[in-house]
Each structure stands twice: as structure tokens, then as C-alpha cells.
């Protein structure tokens, strides 16, 4: 086992704080509308230029082991806030730095670290309660666009495209972000339920121009096994043909005689039909077929529930306004399922999302919710170069997550103003003893840090602006982009409540741990071993050779 180096108390904390400052100073340069870029070197490919706090934090690794511990703990604040709320990483870093710096100073002055931590925690709980009081729900597209714009570093085009995507697929809908091929951002919306399986035979195609199958007001047969004998289908085919309606068959596989018969009947015009493989595998396939059944008001014909294909009638079939099948995808538009049943199914899947521990399962379950609840929107990010594309895509990701957070918990005035109002509301808070009260004061001072940093990055004097904002009431704040004061909500400068709350709670959590640290243990640096002396003397018989 390698030897360890151990440092204690003030020496330990000062090395840790130095690491915190190095990381925080690099990250906080990106805060606010006039925040600067940070360039990150990559071992291969072009460097990355970013204004995303968590991207900067993730790249930082310090040579000194003890300083690096401080930096890594601060990095945890940024990534936890990013995972939980999708934005606010720089705010969290700035808050944590202020709490740690002031807290460690107080410990050095002889105050009890545990009481300081209790004071900070007490102030944060009170501040979070106050933020929830200030919070307003996001009810309209305009507010959603404003939140997305702020999170995308004041890029209105990104804000508007996210608001449009949310409007089209609903708040539960899936919005995915891809790299585009043009200079402009594009939005593609897939209505209804789409799954990645196409027609079983090109002979089903009825729209030759687009090379797709289009079925209007079709019946939908859902089966969880293979269909190879046409005898199994005769009852259903007869009933559907009598009503002169098209039919979509979704089964594990339609093959052999059954597929050939369907193709022949389709070509002759006896019945308009299309067969498609069921999506997914195993249990996930069963669940997706059940989703389709709920969406279309049908029943999955399965032996598990005592149903066989021969006995199936039109009452077991689902219905939809339109079905579109291409070579690779099937889209069911406007399923005729019962709304209460659909909502119940969505609720059931959401419970599974909360219980699952696998990220992959969670993602797949969220996709299922979206397909039942709204649809899928794809934002294609456009840019001139690959470097710009990566930077822009990261901003769109941030903006989307921040927007979801705003929809979830509402919005508060941005630009650090909500924290200033929370300070005013809880300024009379007292602890159980003097050290706890000092901890509360540390937290209240730290809550000024985001506004100070936004102003400093805009090239103004933080103390002057801060005092003016403190004198104001409610939403009155400073717009760093234009250098004007005004109502932050009317100016469209909004932050999701969840983002600010998470930033404050995560910053306080890590700061509390650092303040109460008394010893640090790291691997001792290896001493350089002396190099062995060079072999003496030349080689005999080599004299006269010119080297």
C-alpha cells in the first residue's frame, strides 16, 4: 500500500479552499448575459468553446491532490444541480464558493464548525420556503420561451423553438435534440404514436409517390404471437371487409401463407390491409402493445387473457383516425381510445419511472409516456462549424431542461433577484447560539454572490447595483444585458424555481461538509529515485572512430 500524506485543520481547509477557488473562478466567468467563454482543450479534435458551467467544471483536474479534493467536491455541486434541474450549475458553484470561503474564515476565527453548518442549513431551509412563495406557475408559451432564452445564454431563436416544440407535443411530450445539416435551427414534429417498425411487404404500399401505406379510419388488430396461417385471420378479415374499412395488423410477425394471402387481397382491392412487426422485445413488447391497445381502444389478442385469433371480433380491434406506415416507421394518429384509460395508463407508467433505478429503463418509460400523452418533437440544431454546433447543442440541451424545470415548479424573477428578496424576508432569522446566527449571516451574504457575479461580468460595480436592487421591491432588478433597472418579469428575465432551489440546496450541502472537515488524507507524492551512474569507459578497439 502506498504511503499517505495527512494534513490537519487550517492547513487542510486552506488547501481545499484554494482548489475550490481555482475551479469556481474558471466557472463563474460564464455567469450572466455578459458572461465570457471558456476554451477547453481536447486530446483529439478541435477545442471546445463553452459558456456552460458544468462543462467547464467537468474538465478541471488539479495537480495538487489536496487542492484537487476541493475542486472535485465543488464539481459535485455543479453536476448534481445539472442532473436534478438541468441548469443553474454556475449559480450553484458561485453560491458554494461564497459559503465555503466565508465558512472557513469563521472556523479559522475559532467558531464551532458544526454550529456554523446548522446555521447555514437553517437559513437555506427558510430561503427555499421563501422562494416557493415568490414562485409563479408558467402558464403561457411566452413565459416558456423567456425561460428557455435565458438558459440558452439569451439566444431568442433557441427560446422560441423550444416553446414551439412544447406547444406542439405538450408538456409530457418527448423533445429530442439532434445535430442539423443546415445553418438554421429546424423543428420536426411527429404527431401521435410512432414506433420504429415498417411494413412487412412493399406490396402493401398504396401511396406510390411517397412510397408509404396510408390507412384512413382503420381497424387495428394487436397480437403478441406470430401469424402464419390465414385460417386464424379469416373471421376478422371477413368482419372488416363487410364494413369496407382498412386494417392494420401489428403482431410479432406475419409470415408465410398469412402474409401472401394479405398481399393478394390487398392488390386485388378486396381489403385494404397492412401488416407490421410489433416494436420492442420480450416484456417491453407486451407493454408497448398494451399502450397501443389503450390508445386505440382495442384489446391485445393474447392467450394469456384467454383470447385467440379465431374468436376475435371487431369489438376487440382498436381504431384510429389515420395510420401512416413507411419502410422504417409506423405512426398511429388520433387513436380512438378512452381519455380516462389513457390518463390512467400514463399515471401507471409514471409510477414505474419513479421506482426504476436504471437510466435506460427510465428513458424508455418516458418515451412511452410521451407517445401516449402527446407526440415527439425533434429540434435539429443548425450551425456553420462543428465547434459552434457542439456549443449550441449544449445550450439547447440546457434550455430544454430548464424549461421542463420551469413547467414543473414555476418561475421566479431572474438575475439573482429572487435570492435578494429571500434575504430580505428572512433577515431577522436567529440561531440557537451566536455561532449558528453567524452561520445564518454567512448564508445570507452568500445569496448575494450570484447577482454580484452577474454585475461584475457585465463590467459594472457589484456593490452599487446590489444596494439599488435591495432598495427596490418584488421583481425590481438589474438587466445586465442592457444595463437598465426594471421589473424582471416584465423584462422576460425569469429563472425556474427548481433551478435556483437546487443550486442553493446543493451548494449548502457541500459547503457544510467542507467547513466541518478537520483532516485530509492523500497519497504521498513519490520521491524521484536516483538515476544509476552511466556505465564507465568506452568500448575497446573503437579508438579513432569519430562519433
From Swiss-Prot:
Residues noted as binding ATP in the record, renumbered to the chain: 30-33, 51, 87-91, 415, 479-481, 495
Gene name, Swiss-Prot/TrEMBL: groEL
Catalytic activity: ATP + H2O + a folded polypeptide = ADP + phosphate + an unfolded polypeptide
Subunit structure: Forms a cylinder of 14 subunits composed of two heptameric rings stacked back-to-back. Interacts with the co-chaperonin GroES.
Major site of localization recorded for this protein: cytoplasm
Keyword NAD applies: no
Name of this protein: Chaperonin GroEL
GO cellular component: cytoplasm
Amino acid at each position: 500500500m502506498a504511503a499517505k500524506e495527512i494534513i490537519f485543520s487550517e492547513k487542510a481547509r486552506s488547501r481545499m479552499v484554494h482548489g475550490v477557488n481555482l475551479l469556481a473562478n474558471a466557472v463563474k466567468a460564464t455567469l450572466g448575459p455578459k458572461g465570457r467563454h471558456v476554451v477547453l482543450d481536447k486530446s483529439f479534435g478541435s477545442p471546445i468553446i463553452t459558456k456552460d458551467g458544468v462543462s467547464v467544471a467537468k474538465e478541471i483536474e488539479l495537480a495538487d491532490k489536496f487542492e484537487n479534493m476541493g475542486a472535485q467536491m465543488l464539481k459535485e455541486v455543479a453536476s448534481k444541480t445539472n442532473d436534478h434541474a438541468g441548469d443553474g450549475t454556475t449559480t450553484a458553484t458561485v453560491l458554494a464558493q461564497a459559503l465555503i470561503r466565508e465558512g472557513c474564515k469563521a472556523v479559522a476565527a475559532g467558531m464551532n464548525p458544526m454550529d456554523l453548518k446548522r446555521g447555514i442549513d437553517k437559513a437555506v431551509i427558510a430561503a427555499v420556503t421563501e422562494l416557493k412563495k415568490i414562485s409563479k406557475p408558467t402558464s403561457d408559451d411566452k413565459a416558456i420561451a423567456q425561460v428557455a432564452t435565458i438558459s440558452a445564454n439569451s439566444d431568442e431563436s433557441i427560446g422560441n423553438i423550444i416553446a414551439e416544440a412544447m406547444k406542439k407535443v405538450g408538456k409530457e411530450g418527448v423533445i429530442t435534440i439532434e445535430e442539423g445539416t443546415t445553418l438554421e435551427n429546424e423543428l420536426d414534429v411527429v404527431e401521435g404514436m410512432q414506433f420504429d417498425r415498417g411494413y412487412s411487404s412493399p406490396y402493401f404500399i398504396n401511396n406510390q409517390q411517397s412510397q408509404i401505406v396510408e390507412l384512413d379510419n382503420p381497424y387495428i388488430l394487436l397480437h403478441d404471437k406470430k401469424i402464419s396461417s390465414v385460417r386464424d385471420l379469416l373471421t376478422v378479415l371477413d368482419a372488416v371487409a363487410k364494413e369496407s374499412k382498412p386494417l392494420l395488423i401489428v403482431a410479432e410477425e406475419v409470415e408465410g401463407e398469412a402474409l401472401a394471402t394479405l398481399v393478394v387481397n390487398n392488390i386485388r382491392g378486396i381489403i385494404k390491409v397492412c401488416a407490421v412487426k410489433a416494436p420492442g422485445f420480450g416484456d417491453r413488447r407486451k407493454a408497448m402493445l398494451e399502450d397501443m391497445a389503450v390508445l386505440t381502444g382495442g384489446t391485445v389478442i393474447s392467450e394469456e387473457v384467454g383470447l385467440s385469433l379465431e374468436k376475435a371480433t371487431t369489438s376487440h380491434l382498436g381504431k384510429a383516425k389515420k395510420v401512416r406506415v413507411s419502410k422504417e416507421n409506423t405512426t398511429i394518429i388520433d387513436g380512438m381510445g378512452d381519455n380516462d384509460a389513457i390518463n390512467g395508463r400514463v399515471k401507471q407508467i409514471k409510477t414505474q419511472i419513479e421506482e426504476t433505478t436504471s437510466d435506460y429503463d427510465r428513458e424508455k418509460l418516458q418515451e412511452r409516456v410521451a407517445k401516449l400523452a402527446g407526440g415527439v418533437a425533434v429540434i435539429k440544431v443548425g450551425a456553420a462549424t462543428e465547434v459552434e454546433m457542439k456549443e449550441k447543442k449544449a445550450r439547447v440541451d440546457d434550455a430544454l431542461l430548464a424549461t421542463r424545470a420551469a413547467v414543473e415548479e414555476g418561475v421566479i424573477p431572474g438575475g439573482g433577484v429572487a435570492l435578494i428578496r429571500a434575504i430580505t424576508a428572512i433577515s431577522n432569522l436567529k440561531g440557537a447560539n451566536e455561532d449558528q446566527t453567524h452561520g445564518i449571516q454567512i448564508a445570507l451574504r452568500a445569496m448575494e454572490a450570484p447577482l454580484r457575479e452577474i454585475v461584475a461580468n457585465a463590467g459594472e460595480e457589484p456593490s452599487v447595483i446590489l444596494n439599488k436592487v435591495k432598495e427596490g421591491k418584488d421583481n425590481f432588478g438589474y438587466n445586465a444585458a442592457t444595463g437598465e433597472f426594471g421589473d424582471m418579469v416584465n423584462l422576460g428575465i425569469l429563472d425556474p424555481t427548481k433551478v435556483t432551489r437546487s443550486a442553493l440546496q446543493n451548494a449548502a450541502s457541500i459547503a457544510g461538509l467542507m467547513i466541518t472537515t478537520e483532516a485530509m488524507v492523500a497519497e504521498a507524492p513519490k520521491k524521484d529515485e536516483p538515476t544509476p551512474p552511466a556505465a564507465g569507459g568506452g568500448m575497446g578497439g573503437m579508438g579513432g572512430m569519430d562519433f
